[in-house]
């Protein structure tokens, strides 16, 4: 009798039990092999505890932790390089949104490998499948969000101008059928999503209709504090339009412009980062922007907007947020913008000091 059978005999005491135990073992292992990898991932409540522990670890070190809600993962940057940058910049957690090629599952895989660094985030809506309203893409997104495995959705593009790393000049109306799927999913599940929409005056109404029609959707409008074309973006020349929207729509949030202070948008030649006051004396947070951050401290978060092509900007982006934005507001406001607001959006819970 082999070791396996002798062991079972030893445990069971009777030969008749050997057969049954062998069948049970074979069945159990067979069942495990049939399960998807993430079926054995930790429960959501346990994952939240892991995230919380990491944030408290950074706090204990004397650094204000940051939760980065907008990272574009393309699979070309070695994950350990990203983690090193996160550590060097006090970024506790990253909402790791994959591109269409990798799919949402990739974020779960990386969370499984590094559960205290990466927040499971669905695919970004910035590729051909999204812009063609691909049914399979939308069905997969729906399945993913409803699975309960993801804490956030990626960034979905509406109007998008060509940028420093791509030439996409596209417009998926915010009130299109594809966006209705995203808004509905957020309304049903409470899972937040990011929206890229150039703030042209004539394009604001399509967004406002959706914010009004889906009051339970959690919408993070990306890159506030930016104006790429003051001719078309007349309302967004100052923070007043932002203040008006925040008052009207309690389900609207913003992440902050990531552009280098003083840099010009290549499409128009205008300085786009209106969040900052730039002078010969240096760079500071604009006075009116400071007022709006302190008036609505619960409505702003930090997103790096880093992708493969902009990876070397990571340190500069985080340093700008820390030295200009977070140091430019009250301590309690800085804490909310840095991590507490993102924490509530992803966990559904207030941060406990």
Task: Provide a role label for each language-model segment.
Residues 27-36:
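Bacterial N-terminal signal peptides
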Residues 50-54, 77-81, 101-110, 135-141, ...:
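Alpha-helical scaffolding within the catalytic cores
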Residues 67-71, 94-96, 118-123, 152-154, ...:
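Hydrophobic faces of well-ordered beta-strands that scaffold small-molecule active sites
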